[in-house]
Amino acid sequence: MTTSFYFLLMALGLLLYVCQSSFGNQHTRTFDTPKHRCGSEITNSYMDLCYRKRNDAGKKRGRASPLWQRRGSLSQLKARAKRNGAFHLPRDGRGVVEHCCHRPCSNAEFKKYCS
């Protein structure tokens, strides 16, 4: 193997690295990238985005909040949401399902439905 062959291999590798690093990041998601949320994803997003700030103090002390422990209980969350009206607040005449399931919404848009 000659020196020019190694040089060609190194140049090709460098070219592939530059192409991957400059064009490879266009499809990555950030924290606030709009996305579709349907079904249980709406519930999980509601728990994560709406109750995270309230529970941070408990997490720092090493305790999980009772609401977070009952995360899988959809009926309790539905009852709370119905009582608070969180999922029925009019936002331009649409609810959270119409706004975030039928078309993508960001976390900031989803937080508007927090009570």
Curated annotation (Swiss-Prot):
Residues with the 4-carboxyglutamate modification: 41, 98, 109
Propeptide residue range(s): 25-29, 53-94
Gene3D superfamilies reported for this sequence: Insulin-like
Localization, UniProt: Secreted
GO biological process, one term: glucose metabolic process
Main location: secreted
Tissues expressing this chain: Expressed by the venom gland.
Signal peptide: 1-24
InterPro entries: Insulin-like (IPR016179), Insulin-like_sf (IPR036438), Insulin_CS (IPR022353), Insulin_family (IPR022352)
SMART domains: IlGF (SM00078)
PROSITE patterns: INSULIN
Example of a GO cellular component annotation carried by this entry: extracellular region
4-hydroxyproline modified-residue sites: 34, 104
Pfam family of the protein (one): Insulin
Posttranslational mods: Is different from Con-Ins G1a (AC A0A0B5AC95) due to absence of amidation at Cys-114.
This protein's UniProt keywords: Carbohydrate metabolism, Cleavage on pair of basic residues, Disulfide bond, Gamma-carboxyglutamic acid, Glucose metabolism, Hormone, Hydroxylation, Secreted, Signal, Toxin
Domain of life per record: Eukaryota
Record-annotated disulphide pairs: 38-101, 50-114, 100-105
Record GO terms (molecular function): hormone activity; toxin activity
Family per record: Belongs to the insulin family.
Additional facts recorded: Venom insulins constitute about 1/25 of the total venom of C.geographus.
Record text on subunit structure and interactions: Heterodimer of A and B chains; disulfide-linked.
Function according to Swiss-Prot or TrEMBL: This venom insulin, from a fish-hunting cone snail, facilitates prey capture by rapidly inducing hypoglycemic shock. It is one of the smallest known insulin found in nature and lacks the C-terminal segment of the B chain that, in human insulin, mediates engagement of the insulin receptor (INSR) and assembly of the hormone's hexameric storage form. Despite lacking this segment, it both binds and activates human insulin receptor (long isoform (HIR-B)) with only a 10-fold lower potency.
Protein name as annotated: Con-Ins G1c
Organism: Conus geographus (Geography cone)
